[in-house]
């Protein structure tokens, strides 16, 4: 039996912007995981979104520590627990706001799941930083512009160089 985890992007926080494919996968799931930190984890927001599509009762929170020293042990534990659900024949999904490939804990988690021969089926969501442009009718970049997406930084020299080099940041 193939072990599959569905990584589902929920979009920018509006249940009407959850893709039809994401909704179908979540409705068919037996358990839906969400990870996050202790302080802000998005649980209430995600629960509300899933309640709107009648899937909130399937949601299970998994702590993803901010502290890198503890993170790996938590990820290993999560992978082992996930495999137990999969071995019972359950359909397991993992949700993120926006898209699971951008500013998400899922890539780290999937690396560990892959060690257990778990196959990824990604259901991408509407990336959160594209939603405002769509809502306002503006483009993020024009034809010859250059766009940069950067990880968090507090290095003002780096920010200054990026702002000088790119039209949209």
Predicted regions and their residues:
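Class I SAM-dependent methyltransferase SAM-binding "motif I" and its flanking Rossmann-like core
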Residues: 98-165
